[in-house]
Every structure is written in C-alpha cells, then in structure tokens.
Amino acid sequence: MRNSGSSCSESVGPPLWLLAELTYRCPLQCPYCSNPLEFAREGAELSTAEWIEVFRQARELGAAQLGFSGGEPLLRQDLAELIEAGRGLGFYTNLITSGIGLDEARLARFAEAGLDHVQISFQAADEEVNNLLAGSRKAFAQKLAMARAVKAHGYPMVLNFVTHRHNIDNIERIIQLCIELEADYVELATCQFYGWAALNRAGLLPTRAQLERAERITAEYRQRLAAEGNPCKLIFVTPDYYEERPKACMGGWASVFLDITPDGTALPCHSARQLPVQFPNVREHSLRHIWYESFGFNRYRGDAWMPEPCRSCEEKERDHGGCRCQAFLLTGDADATDPVCAKSARHDLILAARRQAEEAPLGLDALTWRNQRASRLICKA
C-alpha cells in the first residue's frame, strides 16, 4: 500500500505494546474468538527472521511490551526462538495461550528463553462445557495441568475466563477453581462482540440480570479474599452492550497499541481488519512509516473525523468517539457515533440486542464454531 494519509508524527507518541499474532491456526474452535471470520484466506505467515525484524523495529520506536498470541502461538515451532529474540531486545514478554500444545519441556525452554509472563485461557470451570466450547475432549485436563505447571515454574498465575450467557451463571465455581489453582490474577471477561463473537452474539450475550449477579458475586469474593489475605486479584470486564457510554478503545486509535497479524498486516487494534480501510504490511513498509505516516493509522487519530454529536461532546477526550469497529459492525459506517453511546442516533441497535438476550437467545447448538470449514464457507459467501 502506498501512503495516502497525512503525517501527524509531531503529536503522536510511540507504540508501547506490540502484539504479535503469530498464527491463526488453532486446535480449538471457540465461538467467541476475536480472529477474523475470513482467517482461512490468510496469506503466508511471517518467517522467524521477519518477526524478529518486526520486534527490532518496534523496540527502536519505543515499544516495551511484546505479547505472543494467535490463534494458538504454541503451533509456531520457532516460538522459543522468538521469545529469546524479544527478550534479548529488552521487551517484557507475554504468552497468551490456550495451553493446548504446552508441556513441561516447552515451558522450561520458554523460561530459559526469558519469557516473563504466561496467560492461560479457560472456556468454563465445568469440564464438559469447557471441552464442548473448546472443541476438544482433552482440553480441560490439559489446561489444569499446564496452569499448575506455569505456577510451578515461578510465573505469575494469570487465568482468563471468557464469560457469556452459557457459563456466566457458574461464576462462583469459576472463581473457586481459580483460587484452587492459586491464581495471582483472574480476568473474568464477558464476551466483546467482534470476530466470531459478533457472528454468534444472539447466543452469547448475557442478560442484564446474569451480569449483575456475576458482578455481585465477584465483588463478594474480592472482599473475602482481601479479608483472608489472599493476593488473588479478580478483574471483571462487562460487555459494552450494557453501558451508556462507549469505551476509549485501546486508549485511542493508534495511540498505544500495535497489532501485527500472521501475514504481516499492521493494525491499530485486533478487529480493525474488518473496516473499509486499507492497512499497511510490514513486508512493504517500515514500522516507523506505518505508525507515523500511513493512512490507516492516521485515519481516526484526533477528532477532526468525528461527526456530531461526538465533535461537540465534552466527553470526546475521554472516549475518543468510541469504537470504530463496533460502529462499523452495527451501522455499516465506521465514521458513525458508537451505538453504545446513549447520545447516538442508533442506540436503538444496542437496546434491541439487550431485548434479544432476554426474549429470543440462541442455544449452544445454534452457534457457529470457529474452524477452517466455517471460515472457508464464510469466505465463499
């Protein structure tokens, strides 16, 4: 891509957090995956040397944290080499994984390479539900074993549970499992509706009552853990669909976060690829050009792009106009006011989604599972 935007390098700070989406390959088929629906048409993955060059350039720009994700990053056989390269450049390194494909030997190798942090995701605290959502009969047992192994290797125990209408009522058991595993940090993250989660929203969005109950139970456990002197930290993330003001996505468009997809496409957030905006590729441009000069990264910086009521809103410095990806998904217009905002002319779309969660939700059997076959069908359509 040739740059068609204008430079705003004088007012833009450096990227601080680099996310390396090493691959879209994954042994699981979670129906709420944030990967693009059309991942089956993804081009060739960056090579080891290409990834290391990305790390070098990002570090030169000022990035300090390097996350390895996917898909499932463990499917990259060069992962230890990439960790070692990132750590050698001075990054704080973080592995975001399902734990499927991890074993004691690889964990020891990652420790030798300098990995700082491991986050393991669970689909549920119930083995049957976890395995159903993961699409693997062995997933739950493997995750438990690897969570314990991560703790034994001296890493902070960081667990992530994506919650939705089919598992959120078991929030107490989820928290109890985290305590049993001696987790240091637990992210109880209700589905954010992008990628496959957006496709399956009618079967995943909890009701307001479900959310309020889960949040209350989480708060009770926080108090109990604090009283017992237990260091476990519980982080509860609500979906935008029950808010009246939008989030400041990633702290503002292309202000802190830089995502590189498996084929080298650079994005200002995980979901931006779905937008009608052309984004640059690291195989064609330097990260410096991409971050400071490219049209895609400058498209929604600042507030000149904002329509009313955002442009004259006193809250625009706080939420930066909300999420561009969410606006596009719901309205078909990436420039539109985020419908989550009660001031939006399309807030009715959010109200309709809430009503659907109450009146006509879909069951687990109606979900579209994230896998190659489903992605190929979507690509054909």
UniProtKB/Swiss-Prot annotation:
A single GO BP: pyrroloquinoline quinone biosynthetic process
SUPFAM superfamilies noted in UniProt: Radical SAM enzymes
Gene3D superfamilies linked: Aldolase class I
Catalysed reactions, as listed in the record: [PQQ precursor protein] + S-adenosyl-L-methionine = E-Y cross-linked-[PQQ precursor protein] + 5'-deoxyadenosine + L-methionine + H(+)
InterPro entries the record matches: 4Fe4S-binding_SPASM_dom, Aldolase_TIM, Elp3/MiaA/NifB-like_rSAM, MoaA_NifB_PqqE_Fe-S-bd_CS, PQQ_synth_PqqE_bac, PqqE-like, Radical_SAM_PqqE_MftC-like, rSAM
Keyword Methyltransferase: no
Binding partners and assembly: Interacts with PqqD. The interaction is necessary for activity of PqqE.
Cross-referenced HAMAP family: PqqE
UniProt keyword annotation of Oxidoreductase present: yes
NCBIfam families xref list: PQQ_syn_pqqE, rSAM_more_4Fe4S
Broad EC category: oxidoreductase
GO molecular function: 4 iron, 4 sulfur cluster binding; cyclase activity; iron ion binding; oxidoreductase activity; S-adenosyl-L-methionine binding
Organism: Pseudomonas aeruginosa (strain ATCC 15692 / DSM 22644 / CIP 104116 / JCM 14847 / LMG 12228 / 1C / PRS 101 / PAO1)
Database matches in Pfam families: Fer4_12 (PF13353), Radical_SAM (PF04055), SPASM (PF13186)
UniProt cofactor note: Binds 1 [4Fe-4S] cluster. The cluster is coordinated with 3 cysteines and an exchangeable S-adenosyl-L-methionine.
Obligatory cofactor(s): [4Fe-4S] cluster
Protein name from the UniProt record: PqqA peptide cyclase
Radical SAM core domain sequence ranges: 12-228
Superkingdom of origin: Bacteria
Pathway: Cofactor biosynthesis; pyrroloquinoline quinone biosynthesis
SMART domains cross-referenced by the UniProt entry: Elp3 (SM00729)
Keywords: 4Fe-4S, Iron, Iron-sulfur, Metal-binding, Oxidoreductase, PQQ biosynthesis, S-adenosyl-L-methionine
